[in-house]
Amino acid sequence: MGSENKNGKVPLISKIAYGFGDVGCNFSWMFVSNFLMIFYTDVFGISMAAVSALMLFSRFWDAINDPIVGGLTDKTKSKWGRYRPWLLVAAPITAILLVMTFWARPDWPQNGKIIYMVITYCLLVLGYTCVNIPYGTLCGAMTQDIDERAKINTSRSVAAMIAIGVLNIITVPLLSKFGSHSAKTGYLTVAVIYGCIFTACHFFCFAKTKEAVIIPEKEKISVKIQLKAVMQNRPYLLALAGQILFGFTLYGRNADILYYFTYVEGNASYYTTYSMCIIIPSIIGAACFQPVFRKLNNKGRTASLFALFTGISMLSMFFFNAKESPAIFYALSGLTQFFFSGFNTAIYAIIPDCVEYGEWKTGLRNDGFQYAFISLGNKIGMAVGTAFLAGLLGKYGYIANQTQNATVLSIMKHAFTTIPGALWIVTAVVLFFYRLNKKRYNEIVEELKNGRKS
């Protein structure tokens, strides 16, 4: 098993294993993000209005369970640590829930479909929370070295970008292969495959990582006190705002992407070509986080820079399409993904540093609780983004598997280009005000270490 050495260094195998955790996450959650909405409307036969309502309702569910799970992870005591046991137990359960979510019964009455959708989706979200919160918190428990954390998060992001690229390239062909006679069979089979990958990746992450940061034992702390401490943590609040915007922009666009290629471009297979064009830029962009961070010495400013250029390149995509100007369209797609990937690495690298800042500022360390609200913020953004898209499409006359009217097509195009592009620029402005640089962070860590020794 990997472990942190006395200098705070983390073995390569542990960094790789941590990265594989996000491979698993993306083979479940990105599959859900990119394909669940069109599965509900075009395969299961559920109305856009019901899907939109589900996305909003599920966030009230998250508002309850995310902080609870975060608090429980902080209180977990085992021979494997606080966070790693959750990967071992929750991953296989979540995989089963993933399969159940993609088990379509289009012959059921509409009310039966909606009830089944609500139950399975909410359980899936809970299962994913029980995996993703401890997984995300684990990085901060592996080391306090800011550069090592940057390397761990780079490993995570590179692995995630590879996973997303592979998933996007193979999913449509797999759905076609296994669903040649029935689309619902295709989705169910792919869900089984991805559920197995999800579980295996988290088992590997569990086996080859170790929690090395010693956390002092604390008395039981009320939620009210923890919330008060969070509100005093300015870097964390900026990171939380960034995550909400990130969730809205990323998942709203992801929910739209297959609609865009199917109905606006007129050919769903373009999605596979698009995915092939962005996979290499994704990997390079993730790897570029570290050199940009070394130049700026501020993870928030690094995220801000990547977000700005993501927005500019995404706005530019509005003027081109895959059918008439494929070279420019796919080149801009690759450029957009390059900058997005750098941002994705940076935004998650920020979070563990905010924990130390909060401990220094308030005397309270609550890794899981803080990551729970980051997760909740991301999910709130996701809910608003997907519900907003579903609501607009439903209002202006979307009909599954039919030629769409001009307004619906316009919504799909703007949801793919101008709306997320503008929001990326807003995200860049928000994160520009993140001021916890490398020098100040190292001073804080030294003060914390000296305080614990005394």
Model-flagged regions — what are they?
Residues 2-454:
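Membrane-embedded alpha-helical bundles of multi-pass transporters/translocases
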